[in-house]
Amino acid sequence: MAADGYLPDWLEDTLSEGIRQWWKLKPGPPPPKPAERHKDDSRGLVLPGYKYLGPFNGLDKGEPVNEADAAALEHDKAYDRQLDSGDNPYLKYNHADAEFQERLKEDTSFGGNLGRAVFQAKKRVLEPLGLVEEPVKTAPGKKRPVEHSPVEPDSSSGTGKAGQQPARKRLNFGQTGDADSVPDPQPLGQPPAAPSGLGTNTMATGSGAPMADNNEGADGVGNSSGNWHCDSTWMGDRVITTSTRTWALPTYNNHLYKQISSQSGASNDNHYFGYSTPWGYFDFNRFHCHFSPRDWQRLINNNWGFRPKRLNFKLFNIQVKEVTQNDGTTTIANNLTSTVQVFTDSEYQLPYVLGSAHQGCLPPFPADVFMVPQYGYLTLNNGSQAVGRSSFYCLEYFPSQMLRTGNNFTFSYTFEDVPFHSSYAHSQSLDRLMNPLIDQYLYYLSRTNTPSGTTTQSRLQFSQAGASDIRDQSRNWLPGPCYRQQRVSKTSADNNNSEYSWTGATKYHLNGRDSLVNPGPAMASHKDDEEKFFPQSGVLIFGKQGSEKTNVDIEKVMITDEEEIRTTNPVATEQYGSVSTNLQRGNRQAATADVNTQGVLPGMVWQDRDVYLQGPIWAKIPHTDGHFHPSPLMGGFGLKHPPPQILIKNTPVPANPSTTFSAAKFASFITQYSTGQVSVEIEWELQKENSKRWNPEIQYTSNYNKSVNVDFTVDTNGVYSEPRPIGTRYLTRNL
């Protein structure tokens, strides 16, 4: 302890050294210290899994692990050269930092994103201090296209042919025009700060690019505000899918809100009440919006599981069109001053309609143009009338971006943590988990009487169970719940010729109304060797291309088959089992009855419904106090905070108002529609299969039978079709 009035020795030494350095200080950033030099044997503060991404590490740690690591190595070498020249790169933003950011501007990996963010923060902090290195001055000139050597298309990894091939560039949402132009005012990967009420699962509410000084779109009428990209990028335990489609938005309801309700004479089970709105919404909640059939094949043939992690959305190349009629001639022209309005319902204030198997999703074929569906919703009803708790929403009450021709809109979202979807079938059955070579040490009741001469007498006897009486063995687990369905045959002659589509169906009753249990809990479609049967409303049924809406024949639909889950789940058309119904005694025999419905019991295990290329990705878990295993019955991921609804409408423009005042509501508008492109990028986390199985697996393939046609392609009229549903459970795994 130092005496009063004196400093400790260590503090005095430290202050003295600091004063000496300050006394000799020269203008500019201070010179580097010896410890700031890169040492070849130094580990430094390197990000886990990398060799060079981090400060103070050595320069000889072997080959970089990826592009971000390679950029970090070049950055470290540039710092080393500056240190050799007596400059201190750590205390100013310099050309090496700028080159590092530029090299990683298309890198969406965690390390790439983190590296760019760190040096962007460094630049912002040092700018007010004048410690940002000025870029090299060049004479202004027009942007010239960059010449590229023609190359054959190749996989996104850049390899796979003889010799090294250039890798295809990933979609850079932050670019305008060609791939070498300046970034967007609002790049997709850098959303604005989210409002406080958004929660941790949503990164942004979306943003529109600002208007330019000439009141054109932010990117100008002459330049596109984004690039077309449809691809998948496979990166070990992740895959990033990017889809771009062209959309068209008509003016719905002549800009009016309207009540909608069931028709007079409808049955009580079919009554409803709600509202239609002049807004549309974007729906990309189907797997085939994001995966091509070939990518889906790669996904399910190589992975035991997958789940979504992040989503980026962008509207770009927005064009507002005006339609005029003159002497029977229709003219369509750009309207550069009209707007569309866009917003995301990130607080889930509006009734959520995504995940209800609606039409209107992004089409599976990228060349097809689609119409944005109209937003409508239902609220509480009594018959076809509203009740006191019925809710009405005016969407103009929500803040929205107003975008003109050339503007864009971006939105980013992070999925909540959900379990991996199990994309495998079991190679064992739940009732066959034992070693057949060894008897159990537990006993079971094997007899309740024994012969005695010409009669029998009550006598309890017990046995150990082995392979010959495997049905009697003790087991740990029960199959999953059951809600029995009627069995239907694909061969019409096997079915009863009465009308039982409603009367014979399994239903539930809620608030005085009956609804089909469709598809209901996940249950197996049929037993072994009974492929022609299916549960009446216990499977997903997709329509083939060109099928009518009502009463189509079986040849025009695609019926899914959940046969692979019969290893753990009951068969939907069979009873769950039998249950004792009395107390046996001397003069009363034991009796049982079939169990056709069975709720959840302790010890039950089961598989959820499979997902399909044509099926939904997610569903919103209802906002209730209680819920049990909320896995959507139509398949996919149950989410408390799913991707918000993104809504869009054409802003009304009054048409030729009268020159005299009228208090009446304006009801005449110029005829407009809007169009543009939409891109959706989703990052998926993969669970790679690593089976030690010896014999070959069953995998999905397109050559399942001899065919003169190519599946998943267009016909002579240019119509794309999907001839069969593709699930995910081809690989196998033990229970």
Swiss-Prot record:
Region (Disordered): 22-44, 136-224
Protein's UniProt keywords contain Acyltransferase: no
Biased composition (Pro residues): 184-194
Biased composition (Basic and acidic residues): 34-43
Annotated spans, Phospholipase A2-like: 52-97
Stretches assigned to coiled coil: none
Additional information: The ratio at which VP1, VP2 and VP3 proteins are synthesized in vivo is about 1:1:10, which is the same as in the mature virus particle.
Entry function: Capsid protein self-assembles to form an icosahedral capsid with a T=1 symmetry, about 22 nm in diameter, and consisting of 60 copies of three size variants of the capsid protein VP1, VP2 and VP3 which differ in their N-terminus. The capsid encapsulates the genomic ssDNA. Binds to host cell heparan sulfate and uses host ITGA5-ITGB1 as coreceptor on the cell surface to provide virion attachment to target cell. This attachment induces virion internalization predominantly through clathrin-dependent endocytosis.
Name assigned to this protein: Capsid protein VP1
Organism: Adeno-associated virus 2 (isolate Srivastava/1982)
Phylogenetic placement of the source organism: Viruses, Monodnaviria, Shotokuvirae, Cossaviricota, Quintoviricetes
Encoding gene (name): VP1
